[in-house]
Curated annotation (Swiss-Prot):
One of its GO terms (cellular component) is small ribosomal subunit. It comes from Thermoplasma acidophilum (strain ATCC 25905 / DSM 1728 / JCM 9062 / NBRC 15155 / AMRC-C165). Disulfide bonds: none annotated. This is Small ribosomal subunit protein uS13. The lineage of its organism: Archaea, Methanobacteriati, Thermoplasmatota, Thermoplasmata, Thermoplasmatales. The keyword Ribosomal protein applies.
Length: 171
C-alpha cells in the first residue's frame, strides 16, 4: 500500500464524544490553611499534611487514622468540623503517638517527647544549635566553624568559595 492511503490514516474516534464532566462540589476548598501554611486542597489528606514542615507521609497517614479521617479523600473535600479537628491535632505539640514517630524526642529542658510543626520546629532547631555552641560541644564547635557536623569527610567534598584550579610550580 502507498503511504498516503486511507488505511494508514489514524482517525480520532472520540472526536464526536464529549469529555465526562467532573462533579463540582460546592464545599470543596482548593486551599486549606493549617499551621499557618496553605495546603493544596486537591492532594490526598496524608500527602497534603506532608507539605507541613515537621510532618512526613507516614505521620500524615497515622494522624488521619487517629482522627478517623478518610485517607483516600482529598483534603479539600473534608468538612469544616473535620478540618477543625485536624488543625487542633496538628498544632498540638504533644501527641499520643509512639516516641520513634516524633521529631523532637527527649527535649533537653523538659525531657518530653514533642512533635513540632512549621516555625516552632525551625525555632527549636535553631535554639538547640545555639545551646550546643554555648556549651562548646563538638557539634557546637563544628556549627560555629561552618564545618560538617555529622561525620562526613571534608578533604575533598563540601568546599566553599571559588576554585583556583591547578597551581603550577614556578620554573
Amino acid at each position: 500500500m502507498a503511504k498516503g492511503s486511507a488505511n494508514n490514516v489514524k482517525v480520532n474516534q472520540d472526536a464526536g464524544k464529549s469529555q465526562p464532566e467532573k462533579k463540582e462540589n460546592k464545599d470543596f476548598q482548593y486551599i486549606v490553611r493549617i499551621a499557618n501554611k496553605d495546603l493544596n486542597g486537591e492532594r490526598l489528606l496524608p500527602l497534603a499534611l506532608s507539605d507541613l514542615k515537621g510532618i512526613g507521609e507516614r505521620l500524615g497517614y497515622v494522624i488521619a487514622e487517629r482522627l478517623d479521617l478518610p485517607i483516600d479523600k482529598k483534603i479539600g473535600e473534608l468538612k469544616e468540623e473535620q478540618l477543625e479537628k485536624l488543625r487542633e491535632y496538628v498544632e498540638a505539640k504533644e501527641y499520643d503517638l509512639p516516641e520513634w514517630l516524633l521529631n523532637h524526642r527527649r527535649e533537653p529542658v523538659t525531657g518530653k517527647n514533642l512533635n513540632l510543626v512549621s516555625t516552632d520546629l525551625e525555632i527549636q532547631v535553631q535554639e538547640d544549635i545555639n545551646l550546643m555552641k554555648k556549651i562548646r560541644s563538638y557539634k557546637g564547635i563544628r556549627h560555629e566553624k561552618g564545618k560538617k557536623v555529622r561525620g562526613q569527610r571534608t578533604r575533598s567534598n563540601g568546599r566553599k568559595g571559588l576554585s583556583i584550579g591547578v597551581v603550577r610550580k614556578k620554573e
